[in-house]
């Protein structure tokens, strides 16, 4: 008998969390190289994107009509209070007390409410993603099933991961950090480089020389290459057998990425900036603009992730989820999606973020021997102790 995916929502509430005593997303990576900081934000020299000085995130709690509770989290580290406002003041009123056939019907309903006004991305879709994750978590708990088993009939029981970022101040410290992870069974790592390809190649060569046991390297330039430097980077990183070259050009540059994919060198990976199927579909059609698709579950939710993955698969493009900044709820949701993702790529893993909730989060996900096993727990595999969230709650 197929699982019951219908739902009726009793209540929805979102909470803004901040971890002010923790290290930033960048930790000590390239510290002292001209970074600019404000009270909440940080700009790293060489990149355009703003980052949070300390981890902030919006959690969403959904209670179904039968009392089952689920938790969700959006990947919205900059301005999580915006997601909270959208959830608490707008979306909650639209769905509380309503019945839906399944989470897809809920997602479509909420998307339709504002699509005619152009709200097809950004914080509005982040809020939808957080609610979607929470709803699937609640349904999984009600049905006594991991979410992955609700998404696909035979999820992977185990998968291996790569470390996202080697965030230490000096090259030698970065080498030592990678080698310490290799000793745990890790097979791959992704490094963040600027659009300066000469400097990037020097960094990569130094790491490869200092950590020769690592099997796979990935490179992410965070959208900072020109067309010329991206073409050179694709070639040079390809010569070094980089598994993929991530986010080379500006995220709106469809034509540029299409041209780049056709050039020789490392495969091109991207997708974290897309919220919905409607944004990504053109990018995987011929001439395609990417070789590896990387949706971010904190922006797509489970429901649209599965649709996006299928669209990419029909175009012959494998999917491996992106994992950005967030805590155990977002990470657990991402790992559930990894269990049903394309097996040919290692799964991204943020090694230092999953424990930020400390005792407030009881997770069944445990890194061991270079990867994770799908926990024998219902929902996303995480239980939240609300009473212990109090020290992290930001009240505006």
Model-inferred region functions:
Residues 1-69, 88, 188:
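Non-catalytic terminal accessory/regulatory regions of metabolic enzymes
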Residues 2-24, 33-42, 308-311, 325-396:
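Flexible C-terminal active-site loop/helix
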Residues 47, 63-142:
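Metal- or metallocofactor-binding catalytic centers and their adjacent structured scaffolds
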Residues 67, 91, 131, 144, ...:
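Conserved, mostly hydrophobic/aromatic
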Residues 70-72, 161-164, 189-191, 215-221, ...:
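Hydrophobic faces of well-ordered beta-strands that scaffold small-molecule active sites
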Residues 123-128, 132-168:
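Glycine-rich, aromatic-flanked loop segments that form ligand/cofactor-binding clefts
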Residues 149-264:
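Metal-dependent enolase-superfamily TIM-barrel catalytic cores that perform enediolate-based chemistry
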Residues 241, 252-371:
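Shared catalytic-loop signature of beta/alpha-barrel
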């Amino acid at each position: 008998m197929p699982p019951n995916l219908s739902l009726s929502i009793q209540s929805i509430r979102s909470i803004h969390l901040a971890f002010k005593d923790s290290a930033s997303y960048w930790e000590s990576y390239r510290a002292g190289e001209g970074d600019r900081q404000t009270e909440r934000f940080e700009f790293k020299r060489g990149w355009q994107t703003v980052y949070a000085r300390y981890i902030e995130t919006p959690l969403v709690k959904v209670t179904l009509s039968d009392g089952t509770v689920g938790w969700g989290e959006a990947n919205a580290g900059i301005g999580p209070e915006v997601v909270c406002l959208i959830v608490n003041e707008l979306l909650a009123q639209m769905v509380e007390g309503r019945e839906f056939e399944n989470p897809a019907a809920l997602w479509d309903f909420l998307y339709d409410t504002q699509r005619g006004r152009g709200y097809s991305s950004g914080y509005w879709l982040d809020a939808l993603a957080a609610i979607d994750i929470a709803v699937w978590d609640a349904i999984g708990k009600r049905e006594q099933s991991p979410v992955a088993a609700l998404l696909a009939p035979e999820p992977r029981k185990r998968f291996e991961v790569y470390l996202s970022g080697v965030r230490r101040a000096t090259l030698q410290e970065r080498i030592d950090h990678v080698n310490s992870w290799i000793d745990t069974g890790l097979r791959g790592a992704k490094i963040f480089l600027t659009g300066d390809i000469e400097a990037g190649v020097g960094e990569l060569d130094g790491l490869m020389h200092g950590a020769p046991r690592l099997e796979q390297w990935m490179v992410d330039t965070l959208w900072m290459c020109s067309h010329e430097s991206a073409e050179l980077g694709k070639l040079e990183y390809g010569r070094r057998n980089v598994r993929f070259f991530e986010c080379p050009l500006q995220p709106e540059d469809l034509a540029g990425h299409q041209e780049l994919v056709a050039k020789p060198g490392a495969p091109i990976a991207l997708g974290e900036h897309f919220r919905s199927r409607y944004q990504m579909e053109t990018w995987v059609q011929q001439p395609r603009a990417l070789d590896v698709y990387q949706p971010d579950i904190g922006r797509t939710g489970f429901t649209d992730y599965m649709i996006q993955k299928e669209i990419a698969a029909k175009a012959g493009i494998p999917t491996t989820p992106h994992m950005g900044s967030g805590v155990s709820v977002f990470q657990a949701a991402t790992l559930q999606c990894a269990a049903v993702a394309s097996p040919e790529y290692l799964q991204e893993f943020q090694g230092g973020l999953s424990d930020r909730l400390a005792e407030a989060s009881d997770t069944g996900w445990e890194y061991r021997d270079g990867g994770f096993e799908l926990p024998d727990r219902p929902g996303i595999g995480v239980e939240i102790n609300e009473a212990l969230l109090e020290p992290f709650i930001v009240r505006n």
